[in-house]
């Protein structure tokens, strides 16, 4: 009996590099499953001799787009036209990269139609022959059933993705995944396993795809170029993220504070600020970090005592970028200048934040009271007023603070150190900011002016407090009687009415007062008597 020749290229699917990199992990795994299934099914027919390059690459964990797949000529000239006819619509073709068209292309490979046609042709020839080849027909039927079984599993996989079922759960942290391979990759975070090593620099990676991308750093290969500005990138996702700079698109928004990001990864990292999640733990000291890069820098610090040292003053830094910014202190370099007022900055981020003082932009809004802020960090600090959170505690007296800077300032009370002296009057201060504020007294400088009435102030905080007179805002409310105040200090004094607290006591007559000003006024009574 003459058999219809089947070659693996007829039932394989070719991807260009760009197409392959646009697939997500589930699609790549499904592709690998299909190719291996097709290979075993066709091999079971005994139709080709050597293992195809694409199968070798997949077995080695390499990316299959590197292989240029071409059709091999059918060895049976009599059946060549028949084979081509079978695959005329299911051969290799240019692909539309919509998500499910890719999946359909993978799932609907022409293997089943070929095998069913082969089975029908075989049965037709069997009827014309006196000696049927039952063994071959059984093999065709069995292989057909295997392909049908695969198609059912492919459908199940697609359905599982559609309904977002995540059956594979990590025993270490409970995180769940849709695909088993994702769980395998994730496990390596906990075990620290990095089986793929770069031969150039020795750097190791958890996934072979990460190694492939890394190797482009050594080759200098930049395949992705921006059509707007001509800038080239090593990775496709880098180009896509860069293009959003031109469009201004920020599709990923934080539900907690409303901040928007160009890249989903930036949103994921940002959300850990709200959740407090720190998944990366140093096995040496137990310290945890929100980002893997922060853990990596920390671990380098443990290995090398002084990683990045300033040659001018000897100060050490965790990373090279920190040293470069610091070095501008010595050179006086301030390359980022504000076009509105001419003020210059060492760091671009400082300029961005400064420009909001001109535009009045305050993108961060408190969901509790509606107050807006120009910086996300200020919103986080403000939110602690509503929650009452005070995460920074003094180990000397156990007093707690909502800000780390407040704790540092407080600790100098116990130490008694005042390292900052005023050259004009000799007065000493615990903090440099206190000295700076004090020096404006000698200079007579009042740089902060109210736009409503023109009154000037030495401190920005004083201006902010003054402006509440014009706005009528009273954000500090007493929970006992609902009375509201412009100043937090006024609320604190008012609360003593309800609590009966009188912390200021006269040493002469032991009389106590709620406010320090009342004590000062009272002391005059004793002075007059003397």
From Swiss-Prot:
Q: Where in the cell is it found?
A: Nucleus
Q: Which SUPFAM superfamilies match?
A: beta-beta-alpha zinc fingers (SSF57667), KRAB domain (Kruppel-associated box) (SSF109640)
Keyword entries, A-Z: DNA-binding, Isopeptide bond, Metal-binding, Nucleus, Repeat, Transcription, Transcription regulation, Ubl conjugation, Zinc, Zinc-finger
> Which residues does the UniProt record annotate as the domain KRAB?
6-77
From the record heading this protein, give the residue positions of the covalent cross-link Glycyl lysine isopeptide (Lys-Gly) (interchain with G-Cter in SUMO2). 125
Q: Name one GO biological process term.
A: regulation of DNA-templated transcription
Q: Which CDD domains match?
A: KRAB_A-box
Task: Drop me one GO molecular function for this one.
Answer: DNA binding
Which PANTHER family does its entry note? ZINC FINGER PROTEIN (PTHR24381), ZINC FINGER PROTEIN 37 HOMOLOG (PTHR24381:SF390)
Tell me, what does this protein do in biology? May be involved in transcriptional regulation.
Give the UniProt family note: Belongs to the krueppel C2H2-type zinc-finger protein family.
Name the record gives this protein = Zinc finger protein 82
Tell me what organism the protein belongs to: Mus musculus (Mouse)
The organism's taxonomy opens as:
Eukaryota, Metazoa, Chordata, Craniata, Vertebrata
Q: Which gene encodes it?
A: Zfp82
């Amino acid at each position: 009996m003459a058999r219809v020749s089947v070659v693996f290229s007829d039932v394989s699917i070719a991807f260009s590099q760009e197409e392959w990199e646009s697939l997500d992990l589930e699609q790549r795994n499904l592709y690998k499953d299909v190719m291996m299934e097709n290979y075993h099914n066709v091999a079971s027919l005994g139709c080709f001799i050597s293992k195809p390059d694409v199968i070798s690459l997949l077995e080695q964990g390499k990316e299959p787009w590197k292989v240029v797949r071409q059709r091999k000529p059918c060895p049976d000239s009599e059946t060549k036209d028949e084979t081509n006819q079978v695959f005329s619509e299911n051969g290799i073709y240019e692909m539309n990269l919509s998500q499910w068209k890719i999946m359909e292309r993978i799932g609907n490979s022409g293997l089943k139609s070929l095998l069913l046609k082969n089975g029908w042709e075989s049965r037709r020839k069997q009827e014309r022959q006196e000696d049927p080849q039952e063994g071959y027909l059984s093999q065709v039927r069995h292989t057909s059933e295997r392909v049908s079984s695969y198609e059912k599993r492919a459908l199940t996989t697609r359905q599982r993705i559609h309904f977002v079922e995540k059956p594979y759960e990590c025993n270490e942290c409970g995180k769940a995944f849709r695909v088993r391979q994702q769980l395998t990759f994730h496990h390596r975070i906990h075990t620290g396993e990095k089986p793929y090593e770069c031969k150039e620099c020795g750097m190791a990676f958890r996934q072979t795809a990460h190694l492939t991308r890394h190797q482009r750093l050594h080759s200098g290969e930049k395949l992705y170029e921006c059509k707007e500005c001509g800038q080239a990138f090593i990775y496709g996702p880098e180009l896509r993220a860069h293009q959003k700079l031109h469009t201004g698109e920020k599709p990923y928004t934080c539900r907690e504070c409303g901040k928007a990001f160009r890249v989903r990864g930036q949103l994921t990292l940002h959300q850990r600020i709200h959740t407090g999640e720190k998944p990366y733990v140093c096995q040496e000291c137990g310290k945890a970090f929100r980002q893997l890069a922060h853990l990596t820098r920390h671990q380098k610090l443990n290995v090398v005592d002084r990683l990045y040292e300033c040659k001018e003053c000897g100060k050490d830094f965790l990373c090279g970028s920190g040293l470069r910014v610091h070095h501008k202190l010595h050179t006086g370099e301030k390359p980022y200048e504000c076009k509105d007022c001419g003020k210059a900055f060492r760091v671009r981020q400082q300029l961005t934040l400064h420009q909001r003082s001109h535009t009045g932009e305050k993108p961060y809004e408190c969901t509790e009271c509606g107050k807006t802020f120009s910086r996300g960090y200020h919103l986080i600090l403000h939110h602690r007023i509503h929650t009452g959170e005070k995460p920074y505690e003094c180990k000397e007296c156990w007093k707690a603070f909502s800000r780390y800077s407040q704790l540092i300032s407080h600790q100098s009370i116990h130490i008694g150190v005042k390292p900052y002296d005023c050259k004009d009057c000799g007065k000493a201060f615990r903090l440099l900011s206190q000295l700076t504020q004090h020096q404006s007294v000698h200079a007579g400088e009042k740089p902060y002016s109210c736009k409503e009435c023109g009154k000037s102030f030495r401190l920005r905080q004083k201006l902010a407090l003054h402006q509440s007179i014009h706005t009528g805002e009273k954000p500090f409310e007493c929970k006992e009687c609902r009375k509201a105040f412009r100043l937090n200090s006024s609320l604190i004094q008012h609360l003593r009415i309800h609590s009966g607290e009188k912390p200021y006591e006269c040493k002469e007559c032991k009389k106590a007062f709620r406010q320090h000003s009342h004590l000062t006024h009272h002391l005059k009574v004793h002075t007059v008597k003397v």
